[in-house]
Curated annotation (Swiss-Prot):
Protein name as annotated: Cysteine--tRNA ligase
Similarity comment: family membership: Belongs to the class-I aminoacyl-tRNA synthetase family.
Recorded catalytic activity of this chain's protein: tRNA(Cys) + L-cysteine + ATP = L-cysteinyl-tRNA(Cys) + AMP + diphosphate
Gene this chain is encoded by: cysS
Organism of this sequence: Nitrobacter winogradskyi (strain ATCC 25391 / DSM 10237 / CIP 104748 / NCIMB 11846 / Nb-255)
Binding, ATP: 285
Length: 477
């Protein structure tokens, strides 16, 4: 079956023809690591993980290269570091913020069932020329200047948008329609209001690198152009991200890459997922409906309970990736009901009910034609999920859900463990351990802790609002 994908640039669904079938290449914009990822950030991660899995199924695991960057240099990071660690030197504070946030991001997306990309380059590793010869940002900018597409002014290096005749093709914005101050920075040094920063100077207190234009740091857009070139080449197959990145980020990536390399394209297919709102409203901290992936997984902030990663992932995929999605408690409950029903229909669930341990599975997926037909039609996961109930043999349920990253057997085992622990004396043991700790009987406390650990119970000690010791628990996944 032929894969067809909706291409934002041509505004139509196109048959996918890779440049090199032995090395299909995809780049997706990753997180800026200044804060924990929210549920809206999870959507492109899940969507393009499904595409990564599908490409591997169609072309082979060893014939797909997927790069997703980590932006660890940004003014938001600087501000967060100064706020959270005011007593530390800024560079040290930045390192603490980015390392903690990046580690949490990796844990979150793993809990959502996402495969690690082939490459996850960090922006700070690609600012200056590298010993391995991979493309870096300073060299990229010098190339743009040499080709007449960038200029130095007011201590900055700026991209000259007039040097690219079809600038704005991705977003459909003509240069004469773009007003200064409307999503383009006002700068008296610019030749055109839409010109954007490639390099800016850093103050003594700001992070920076020595360059031909003075000590400074890269602009946002140049990072992705350099890192995608480093791992995927001048022109590659697919570039993905959220709708909010079409302008200015992806538009400017295209301009930089095409002008630096003298190519007809940066990527042959541009894919974008739709927006996410929460309970019918735009997600924002001021409305109190802002929720991170970690909060959904580990706290009772949303709906008064924790949500398994499989439920979050299924809920995301019940809506087509290009359509807007309303993230609601009701929808999550419906997704959980669907998963429970599927578990009940798989004969292997009987093994899970007997408590067999979860094992890493390497499964050669045998996808029924009707399932694959839906997936190759622009990742039509809603259609694919609607067809699961029509399948007539048990393995098909398992393989169909595995193809979109949901390990239903693992989820089934977890369900069974939850049922077992609900009827056990875990709560009593947790209370007994806490009491032993409070009376400083650490030998007894450690004994109970080890007993619970052997049962797969993970303990978390803390304090309540009044400062009193409390212990919560959960089942290890």
């Amino acid at each position: 079956m032929d894969l067809r994908l909706y291409d934002t640039l041509t505004r139509r669904k196109r048959a996918f023809t890779p440049i090199d079938p032995s090395n299909v290449r995809m780049y997706v914009c990753g997180p800026t690591v200044y804060d924990f990822a929210h549920i809206g950030n999870a959507r492109p991660v899940i969507v393009f993980d499904v595409l990564f899995r599908l490409l591997r199924h169609l072309y082979g695991d060893d014939h797909v290269t997927y790069a997703r960057n980590i932006t660890d240099v940004d003014d938001k990071i600087n501000d967060r570091a100064a706020r959270d660690f005011p007593d530390l030197p800024l560079n040290e504070a930045i390192r603490k913020v980015t390392e903690k946030t990046a580690a949490q991001f990796q844990a979150d997306v793993a809990a959502l069932g996402c495969l690690p990309p082939t490459h996850q380059p960090r922006a700070t590793e690609f600012v200056l020329p590298r010993t391995d010869g991979k493309t870096d940002m300073v060299t990229f900018i010098k190339q743009l200047i040499a080709r007449g597409h960038a200029y130095e002014a007011g201590g900055e290096v700026l991209f000259d948008v007039r040097s690219m005749p079809d600038y704005g093709a991705l977003s459909g914005r003509r240069l004469d329609e773009q007003k200064a101050g409307a999503r383009v920075a006002v700068d008296a040094h610019k030749r055109n209001p839409a010109d954007f920063v490639l390099w800016k100077l850093s103050s003594e207190n700001e992070p920076g690198w020595d360059s031909p234009w003075g000590r400074g740091r890269p602009g946002w857009h140049i990072e992705c152009s350099a890192m995608s070139t480093a791992y995927l080449g001048d022109v590659f197959d697919i570039h993905g991200g959220g709708l909010d990145l079409i302008f200015p980020h992806h538009e400017n990536e295209i301009a930089q890459s095409r002008c630096a390399h003298g190519t007809h394209a940066m990527a042959n297919y541009w894919m974008h997922n739709g927006f996410l709102q929460v309970e019918g409203e735009k997600m924002s901290k001021s409305l109190g409906n802002f929720v991170t992936i970690n909060e959904l997984l580990t706290t009772e902030k949303f709906g008064g309970r924790k949500w398994p990663g499989e439920v979050l992932r299924l809920n995301m995929l019940r809506t087509h990736y290009r359509q807007p999605i309303d993230w609601t408690i009701k929808a999550l409950e419906e997704s959980e009901t669907i998963l429970r029903r599927v578990c009940g229909r798989i004969k292997q669930f009987e093994y899970a009910r007997r408590g067999m341990p979860t094992k890493e599975r390497s499964v050669q997926l045998n996808l029924p034609p009707e399932i694959l037909e839906a997936l190759v039609d622009d990742l039509n996961t809603p259609l694919m999920l609607s067809r699961i109930g029509e399948l007539s043999y048990d393995d098909a349920f398992d393989h169909a859900l595995l193809s979109i990253g949901i390990d239903v057997l693992s989820y089934a085992r977890w369900l069974r463990s939850q049922e077992q622990y609900a009827s056990s004396n875990v709560d009593e043991l947790v209370v007994a351990r806490l009491e032993a700790r409070m009376r400083k009987d650490f030998k007894e406390s450690d004994r109970i802790r080890d007993e619970l650990a052997a049962m797969g119970v993970v303990l978390k000690d803390g304090k309540d609002a009044d400062g009193k010791p409390v212990t919560t628990w959960e089942i290890a996944r």
